[in-house]
Regions:
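Short loop/turn segments at beta->alpha junctions
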Residues: 90, 211, 272-275
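ABC transporter nucleotide-binding domains
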Residues: 2-4, 9-202
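Charged/polar, solvent-exposed surface patches and flexible loops
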Residues: 100, 112-115, 168, 172, ...
């Protein structure tokens, strides 16, 4: 389990990047970390991987602190958004380095993945395209057989075939080895296909965090036609109208919403599920965040 409890981090004495952040990734989960631009997602990830030390609060993996703890860090596979950390070495040189630094490095898996990624192991990574560098990063990181896989915008720039291949490999590790995955991405449609838990951040703190199924069961879109007032008990996040048809985005489970709407004797009442992207937009809209600034 990955846990951040009441974590605060300030840079330059003024900019508070994390503000009392609490985050929990259950063991064996695939957790999608999403949020507004500048929400603090990458800063949170750099605490989880032990790169940053928090000003206050705690950061633990498996109940143990991460910062300056090599034993815990050796169980983490991390792919950052900026792959400049890999420097100018070749894949063969980096694989040899990983083999000495990570006792869990699986040489057999590294060899097996050669047919998946098909990269020249003698070419310096700096000569690779951004997409090829991502391939190399996944090849090396998946060869670690990590207990915890932490990914920051991991498949940005990859073609659809390779994206599917990489997610398939990662999910095989979840199913076969109980790997815990945390992935930060702006591609909410893709996260919805692979994640079972979601956390939504804004301005350094967590807006909400729960399983994806619970999250989707607590928001509903309604299209209705009624001549009567709507019940005051409805938690309306957004409403619009086209002619006589009203469209409402509501917080609440579908059955409760349906029962409440029945009191207004609607002539038409259709309940529709919301996508993760829609939940994200309307949840952040409630904080005053301008929807036009969202990057999805």
């Amino acid at each position: 389990m990955i846990e951040l409890s009441h974590v605060t981090k300030t840079f330059g004495g003024a900019t508070r990047a994390l503000d009392d952040l609490t985050l929990t990734v259950p063991q064996g989960a695939v957790y999608g970390l999403v949020g507004s631009n500048g929400a603090g997602k990458t800063t949170a990830i750099r605490h989880i991987t032990g790169i940053f030390r928090q000003d206050s609060g705690s950061v633990t993996i498996g109940g143990l602190p991460v910062y300056e703890n090599p034993a815990v860090k050796s169980r983490i596979g991390y792919i950052p958004d900026d792959l400049g950390v890999f420097g100018g070495g070749t894949l063969r040189e980096l694989a040899a380095f990983y083999r000495t630094m990570y006792p869990r490095f699986d040489a057999k898996r590294y060899a097996a993945l050669r047919d998946v990624f098909r990269l020249d192991e003698a070419t310096p990574l700096r000569r690779f395209s951004k997409g090829m560098q991502k391939h190399a990063a996944f090849w090396l990181t998946l060869s670690l057989r990590p207990d915890y896989l932490v990914l920051d915008e991991p498949v940005d720039g990859l073609d659809p075939v390779m994206r599917r291949q990489i997610w398939s490999l990662a999910l095989e590790d979840v199913a076969g080895y109980g790997t815990t995955v945390l992935v930060s991405s702006h591609n909410l449609r893709e996260l919805e296909d692979i994640c079972d838990h979601v956390g939504i951040m804004h301005m350094g703190h967590m807006l909400l965090e729960r399983s994806l199924s619970d999250l989707q069961d607590n928001f509903v879109k309604v299209q209705l036609v009624t001549e009567n007032p709507l019940p005051q008990s409805l938690q309306i996040l957004h409403e619009s109208a086209l002619g006589r048809v009203q469209t409402l985005i509501l917080r609440g489970d579908p059955q409760t919403v349906a029962d409440e709407l029945a009191a207004s004797a609607p002539m038409l009442c259709d309940l529709l599920p919301l996508s993760l992207e829609e939940i994200f937009i309307y949840e952040l809209g409630g904080t005053g965040y301008d929807v036009k600034n969202l990057v999805l």
